[in-house]
């Protein structure tokens, strides 16, 4: 209807702003009015264009497809007090629901009938279920996949048709699914994989000049040597010579090769032929064989990327963030990805605070990461296993794990420098080993058995030292230390068929417990502190964080997104406080957008004094909760708008430190910072560029103003963020 609320076909918004814009500007001929009408207006829906009679006929046709053969749909036009407005009321009489009474499968070959009988528990159509057209088609698709997974390569959906009898029993359907008489002969025979030719190309039309043959496998390529080692491709290629053709093997092979990220184009074609084989009795038999030709076109070897974020706040704090990186595909002919990136950010004060003018850079951070990803799970047990050894294991019945996509093993080293001008310079050096894999589209896992980092102060000023002397909690969190960590992340996402999916990710990590267990076996107490690693104290903690996103597709051009994020960290044993880099914070382009990073918290503690320039050091916590709601309508083309509401804060677990900072279950919801705002997003296909304007609504501490809206200055509680990608 005109002024539909959130895309609803029934409810209308009480304020049809787009209709008002249309009425106000559509009759004007000037360019500005035409632009306003096109961008912000919405043409009213006319009864002449609705055609309720046709809609009623379409609805009856849909009822037939659902099994309501006697369903009736009538309509009535309801006039309103305004003669220009009217509503259409539809009356739907479902009638009797026709159900399946008997089901028979006819004319299938003997082996095909055996396959059907052995999988009847998986049948979509069963006695007593509604007679739905969609269910009938799903059953035909099930049989097609069943047959093609047992060698019937040429079998198609159209080779079976339905006969339905609705006369014998009122309200019941006797159904027959029969194979058609004009089926091609090869569709009733089982086919086996024969020779496999794999063609490596750097360009689609490249001529291949050399080849390498290994039994039934032939690799063709251009140049003096193969561009990639054979075993890398064979790990993803589920097709094997002399094996019965299975469509699922072909599907997994294509998906696996694509997920490697090395090829821009993959294609599998089959050439049928008849071969002679000798059975166990020495008799010659003829076998239908499919020779596979697989074309693999390499993607560009290098990827250069730039990621940028910018932020500005009306209190005067501004600064950009930049990431520049280079990725080399197939770095060492083993499908590896070598990634090198440099990142940096800085922030400065542009207006006068209580301490006077400050135009110099207040803080900056820069660093570099180097990572190498392998397209397999590499462990000490399989790191040096050869291709021939893998083939022998396969013949001996050791089936490889089946993954959704290509699993990866990533080795990473990093170095970061954090500088707070006039206070400190902190260095963080680290390395990690991570395994990523997926068992299906819905379930993904990431396990890091070793994440080792060393954090130390390269420089501290006397002013910073005096601050630390007066704040033991912050001093402990920023002390020099090793962090030997282990982490696991599980991500669930709804199946692709759902209109309104969810994504739920949970990360559990720990640090120092394995080392402390070793010390415990050596006779030291678990709770004893001061234990060292390489002559430096190490951290000991347990951390959990969960992230939940829900999408509602309101209509083809607008989406509503809800986001929840929560986390908690416990420090114990060798640590009285978690490291500064592991603490939680809120604010910024991907959090509460009305406030800067580390601009709020912990709890209802007030660090709003501009003279307190080290406040962002203190605005961290052991506990975090954040909630976001964002409406994303399309404005036109690839330009989308955003209307959002953000809330959240961080707290400390230890109430002894400060009453204002401590988490209390009965009061935490009262200490949530709240902000709103609007934004625009430009979808460029490969990535999204967005600008968000955040406006503060509520601060968790006492500002001297009563009521929910307690912002002391509207002008000073706004933030502008330029970022790449969606916030969640």
How should each PLM-predicted stretch be described?
Residues 115, 226-227, 246-505, 593-594, ...:
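Gram-negative/organellar outer-membrane beta-barrel architecture
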Residues 1-259, 265-268, 289:
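Interaction-mediating elements
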Residues 76-78, 91-97, 105-110, 178-184, ...:
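Solvent-exposed coil/turn segments that connect beta secondary-structure elements
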Residues 215, 219, 223, 311-315, ...:
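C-terminal outer-membrane beta-barrel translocator/porin domains of Gram-negative envelope proteins
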Residues 68, 152, 170, 301, ...:
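Strand-connecting loop/turn motifs
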Residues 306-308, 338-342, 411-413, 504-508, ...:
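Membrane-embedded beta-strand positions of outer-membrane beta-barrel proteins
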Residues 503-505, 528, 532, 541-546, ...:
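In a subset of proteins, long, contiguous C-terminal domains/tails are tracked
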């Amino acid at each position: 209807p005109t002024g539909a609320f959130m895309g609803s076909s029934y409810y209308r918004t009480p304020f049809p702003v787009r209709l008002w814009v249309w009425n106000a500007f559509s009759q004007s001929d000037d360019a500005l009015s035409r632009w306003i009408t096109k961008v912000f207006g919405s043409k009213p829906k006319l009864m002449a264009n609705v055609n309720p009679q046709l809609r009623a006929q379409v609805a009856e046709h849909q009822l037939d497809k659902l099994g309501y053969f006697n369903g009736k749909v009538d309509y009535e036009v309801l006039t309103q007090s305004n003669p220009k407005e009217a509503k259409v009321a539809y009356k739907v009489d479902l009638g009797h629901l026709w159900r399946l009474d008997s089901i028979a499968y006819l004319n299938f070959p003997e082996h095909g009938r055996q396959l059907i009988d052995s999988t009847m528990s998986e049948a979509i159509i069963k006695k007593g279920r509604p007679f739905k057209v969609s269910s009938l088609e799903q059953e035909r698709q099930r049989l097609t996949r069943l047959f093609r997974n047992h060698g019937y390569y040429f079998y198609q959906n159209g080779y079976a048709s339905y006969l339905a009898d609705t006369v014998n029993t009122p309200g019941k359907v006797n159904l027959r699914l029969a194979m058609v008489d004009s089926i091609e002969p090869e569709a009733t025979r089982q086919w086996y994989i024969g020779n496999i030719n794999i063609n490596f190309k750097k360009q689609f039309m490249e001529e291949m000049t050399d080849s390498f043959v290994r039994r039934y496998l032939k690799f063709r390529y251009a140049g003096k040597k193969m561009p990639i080692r054979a075993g890398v491709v064979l790990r993803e290629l589920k097709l094997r010579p002399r094996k019965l053709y299975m469509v699922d093997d072909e599907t997994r092979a294509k998906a696996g090769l694509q997920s490697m990220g090395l090829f821009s184009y993959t294609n599998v074609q089959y050439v049928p032929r008849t071969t002679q084989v000798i059975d166990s009795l020495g008799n010659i038999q003829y076998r239908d064989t499919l020779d596979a030709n697989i074309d693999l076109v390499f993607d560009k070897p290098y990827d250069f990327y730039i990621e940028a974020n910018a932020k500005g706040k009306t209190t005067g704090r501004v600064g950009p963030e930049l990431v520049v990186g280079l990725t080399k595909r197939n770095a060492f002919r083993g499908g590896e990805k070598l990634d090198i990136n440099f990142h940096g950010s800085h922030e400065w004060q542009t207006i006068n605070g209580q301490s006077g003018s400050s135009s110099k850079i207040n803080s900056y951070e820069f660093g570099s990461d180097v990572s190498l990803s392998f397209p397999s799970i590499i462990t000490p047990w399989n790191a040096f296993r050869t291709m021939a050894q893998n083939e022998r294991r396969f013949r001996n019945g050791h089936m490889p794990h089946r993954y959704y996509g290509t699993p990866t093993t990533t080795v990473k080293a990093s170095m970061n420098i954090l500088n707070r001008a006039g206070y400190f310079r902190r260095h963080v050096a680290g390395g990690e080993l991570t395994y990523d894999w997926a068992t299906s589209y819905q379930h993904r896992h990431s396990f890091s058995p070793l994440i080792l980092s060393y954090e130390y102060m390269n420089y501290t000023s006397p002013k910073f030292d005096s601050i630390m002397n007066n704040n033991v909690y912050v001093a402990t969190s920023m002390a020099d230390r090793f962090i030997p960590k282990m982490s696991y992340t599980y991500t669930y996402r709804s199946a692709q068929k759902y209109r309104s999916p969810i994504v739920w990710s949970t990360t559990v990590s720990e640090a120092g417990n394995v080392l402390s267990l070793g010390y415990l076996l050596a006779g030291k107490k678990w709770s004893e502190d001061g234990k060292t690693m390489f002559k430096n104290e190490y951290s000991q903690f347990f951390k959990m964080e969960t992230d939940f996103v829900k999408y509602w597709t309101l209509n083809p051009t607008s989406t509503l997104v809800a986001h929840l994020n929560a986390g908690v960290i416990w420090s114990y044993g060798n640590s009285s406080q978690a490291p500064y880099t592991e603490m939680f914070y809120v604010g910024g382009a991907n959090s509460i957008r009305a406030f800067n990073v580390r601009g709020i918290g912990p709890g209802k503690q007030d660090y709003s004094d501009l003279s307190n320039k080290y406040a962002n050091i203190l605005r961290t916590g052991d506990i975090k909760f954040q909630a976001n709601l964002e409406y994303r309508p399309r404005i036109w083309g690839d330009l989308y708008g955003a209307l959002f509401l953000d809330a959240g804060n961080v707290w400390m677990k230890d109430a002894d430190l400060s009453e204002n900072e401590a988490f209390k279950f009965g009061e935490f919801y009262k200490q949530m910072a709240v902000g709103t705002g609007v934004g625009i997003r430009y979808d460029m296909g490969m990535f999204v560029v967005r600008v968000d304007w955040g406006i503060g609504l509520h601060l968790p501490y006492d500002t001297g103003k009563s009521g929910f809206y307690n912002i002391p200055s509207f002008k000073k509680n706004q933030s502008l963020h330029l970022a790449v990608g969606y916030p969640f």
